Structure formats: structure tokens, C-alpha cells
Amino acid sequence: MSVLTNPSLLLLRNSEKLVGKSILVVNFVQDGFLAELKKRNPESKITAFSYNHANGEFAKNTPGVDVCVNHCISGNDFDLVILYYPKSKPEVLMALDNIRAVITADAELLVVGENKSGVKSIEKQLTDKANFSNKIDSAKHCVLYSFAELKQLSQFNISDYHKPFTVSVADSEFTAISIPGVFNHGNLDVGTKILLENAPLIKQGTVLDFGCGAGLIATYLGLQNPALSFVCSDVSALAIYATTQTLKLNNIKGEALLSDGLTNITGKFDLIISNPPFHTGIATDYTVAETFLANAKQHLTKAGKLNIVANSFLKYPPILEAQFDNYQTVFKNNKFAVYSS
């Protein structure tokens, strides 16, 4: 058995509940749970859904499990749904609505999560959406709930969850589209604003917006320099969807790609610009950003530049120094720093 996370261990110690003809696992984690679930349901159809491309890549070769990474769940016949509770409450509310549009009338919903994820809010969140609820078990700082007689929805339309918002940087203003689960949902964060205020001026070429979120960086630069073309990447299918909507709304030419770090990125760029992520799920995780910085140079043209913003306390300068002959700190205050190669 692969190493299992505490939420998965809690599910498996209640294995009598893990039975269904068509089982959907939402927001699964990178452990051995899907394989264990298939062992207990060898004849069942099991679908594993995630918004996260890295999780999808981890699980894609699990025998007997269909893995889907997308911005919404499709189907209509799931009689058991297992939801790993996400840290974003707007995201969980959207996911619950999506789930209620793809289940059978007699479906059961199991919700598991760590206490620190906010999972105990689930009973309140489903008060008017399920007629029956039960706290099944708790252990290892995790809780498992069961819900039945869920109120089905006839359809799910992600456009109902669009959140348009205005982005103002320097003398530029535009409208962006966000959806739940996207970084800093519905707002321009301070770090990205500082990055854009200190972005280099390039007249033409191709730009990589790494960790694109709602596509704010590419849109701002594209409005400043219409000759630029963009590749926007993110590990989140929700971010890719939001970026696509924002680019389209502002007539910016570019493509949005799912990628775990730089793994799906090809070619070289005249500018790589990013507010790189340092959270994975609930936990703080610098691995993605550090790996990105260590490998960004090979994706730059000879005269290409790297521009990033980071919290001032993060130890990125030694990594930059190891990769680039010269880099500059173009902005720094007590919270943020902008680095340029």
C-alpha cells in the first residue's frame, strides 16, 4: 500500500461506506487511496476528478480509475461521491453545486478533511442542500461526514460563478474574470500589483505568464504592448479557465496551458514573469517556486528576462544567483521584493 494521508486513512477505516456502482472522488490527494478504493470495488466505475493538474498526473496510471482534470465535473450517474474538503470555501460551495448536478437521486456524499481545512463548516454549508447528515468518525485531526437525500440540480453552469472585477495599475484599467478557487479570487493582490508596476518594457516577442491565476499579468502587459503574444500556465484548471475568459474579454492574444511547473512548457520566451506560488493545498510549499527559478533560464531567449515578485523573507536570491550571472533587486520593501535577471 502506498503512503496514505490522514483523511484517506479515516476513509479506509470506514470502508463499509466506500461502496457504490459509480463512484466519484473529488479533490483527491497524492496518495494510494484511489488504488485501495478500486480494490474494494473491482466491478465499479470509479472516476477521480481534480482541478489540479499535478494531482491528475500523479493518479493517471491508477488501474481501473478514470482520471479527469477540468474546471467542472461532467456525468449524471454517480451514486457515491467522496469529497476531500478544499481550503477555499468559495471553491467548496461551487464544487458542491457541481456535485449535486451529476448524482443519482439516492446518492450518498462523504466529505472528509483535516480540521485545519475548515471541514467542520460542511454541515452548515449543506443545511439546505441535504435532508440527512451524520458525523461518522474523527481521528488524526480529521473528520468524516455523510450526507444523503441531497437536493439535485438539473444542470451546472460555471458561468454562474464568474466574478468580474476591475484591475487598476498605474494608468491602465481593465476588467478581469475570476471564479472560486483561483488565487486571490476577485481581487488584484498587492504582490502582483507591485510586479506590474515594476515590469520591464518590451515592445514585441513572446511572454510566459507563469502561475497565471486569472490572467492579470498577461492582460496588463498585452494592453500596454499589443504586439506581444502570451503563453499563460498554471497547475489549476480553474485558473486556466479564468485566464481564458479574461484574455478573451480584453482581446489579448495568447494561450492558456495546464502545467505542473514548467513540465508542459516548450520553446523560449523573451520575458518570463511571475508571482510564483508557494502554497500547495493548505500547506506552505516552496518547491514549485524554487524548481521554477532553477529551470527558468533554459526557457529564455538569449536576451530574455525573468521578472518575479516574492515575499521579502523568501530565500530566492541564492537560487537566482546560481542561475543568472547578474540579477537585480528592482524593488523591495518590508513585505515584497521584485527581482529581474
Curated annotation (Swiss-Prot):
EC number(s) per entry: 2.1.1.172
SUPFAM superfamilies: S-adenosyl-L-methionine-dependent methyltransferases (SSF53335)
Assembly information from the UniProt record: Monomer.
One protein family per Pfam: MTS
Cellular compartment(s): Cytoplasm
Record key words, sorted: Cytoplasm, Methyltransferase, rRNA processing, S-adenosyl-L-methionine, Transferase
Name of the protein in its database record: Ribosomal RNA small subunit methyltransferase C
Record-linked CDD domains: AdoMet_MTases (cd02440)
